């Protein structure tokens, strides 16, 4: 959150060092679309030396917090949508309508279904760290008068995934042949275990 970045800036600058706020968006360098490193603060152009063909550096006005803010807004949409997709899939499974939902998505929103199949099965690998990111997003929006509840809920979904049997995987070790149905079954088992523990 921008407020978190400003708190860190105070600590670092009090110690006598310079602080430049940064937020990176995109996959690691070497992929089709280069990542974008957003920077802001005191003379952020100093980090333009990091620019290269496979990484773009973009400076922002607005001081410390601006780079963090754009990262929060982008992740709110991108990763927030991942949790909504997971919520819908697990919810449909719990309601006994997984096949019916899949058929409806295939008919009405085939691109949405394809996107879900391409990412939901492996979300558990990053869920633990992304949960904290959702809470930072919630704080970002609360600080400007918007509801934090959407992304507090997103954090809860990532917590559920982090409790699942798939969470021991990393991006490198994740089973890439896993189907969306297998992932939803694992997430549903995590949900059932929580219910038993709460009983």
Predicted feature residues:
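Generic hydrophobic, helix-prone segments enriched in Leu/Val/Ile
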Residues: 37-39, 99-103, 183-190
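Alpha-helix boundary/capping residues
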Residues: 12, 53-54, 108-112, 157, ...
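Rossmann-fold dinucleotide-binding core
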Residues: 1-79
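Helical "substrate-binding/catalytic lid" subdomain
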Residues: 70-176
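Short, basic/aromatic-enriched C-terminal tail that caps enzymatic domains
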Residues: 172-199
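Metal- and O2-centered redox machinery and metal/ROS homeostasis
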Residues: 6, 10, 144-147, 199
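Solvent-exposed, flexible loop/coil residues
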Residues: 28, 64, 74, 124-127, ...
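Short, basic, helix/turn surface patches
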Residues: 44-55, 129-131, 175-182
């Amino acid at each position: 959150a921008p407020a978190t970045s400003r708190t860190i800036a105070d600590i670092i600058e009090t110690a006598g060092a310079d602080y430049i706020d940064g937020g990176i968006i995109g996959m690691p360098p070497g992929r089709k679309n280069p990542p974008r490193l957003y920077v802001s603060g005191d003379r952020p152009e100093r980090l333009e030396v990091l620019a290269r063909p496979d990484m773009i550096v973009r400076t922002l006005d607005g001081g410390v917090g601006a780079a963090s803010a754009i990262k929060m807004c982008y992740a709110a949409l991108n990763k927030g949508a991942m949790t909504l997709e997971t919520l819908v899939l697990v919810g449909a499974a719990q309601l006994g309508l997984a096949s019916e939902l899949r058929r409806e998505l295939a008919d009405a929103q085939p691109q949405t279904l394809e996107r879900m199949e391409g990412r939901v099965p492996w979300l558990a690998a990053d869920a633990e760290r992304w949960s904290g990111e959702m809470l930072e997003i919630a704080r970002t929006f609360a600080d400007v008068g918007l509801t934090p509840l959407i992304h507090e809920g997103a954090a809860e979904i990532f917590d559920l995934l982090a409790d699942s049997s798939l969470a021991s995987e990393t991006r490198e070790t994740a089973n890439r042949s896993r189907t969306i149905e297998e992932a939803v079954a694992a997430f549903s088992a995590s949900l059932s275990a929580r219910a038993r523990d709460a009983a």
